[in-house]
């Protein structure tokens, strides 16, 4: 996937992506760096859905292969801890689908 960082375009292996966030732009996070994409979040979702990515909220997509643990949070949300220790909150709108995708009751 082509992403921008420091004025350069980088071709990044999607396996390295931890999560993607849309806050005033679309940002892609890896363990080593943050990149920017010209694509909107829904476009990233369409590209990555078949590669193990999951829509966690209106603002974020996470790589299910990088999930270390899950914890129930208030209002039926789920707090996901990634392999690097960062935490992403899965909104209740997407929480049931996350449980289904991971085979959790």
Regions found by a protein language model. Give the residues of each.
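Conserved binding/recognition cores within well-folded domains
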Residues: 1-83, 87-89
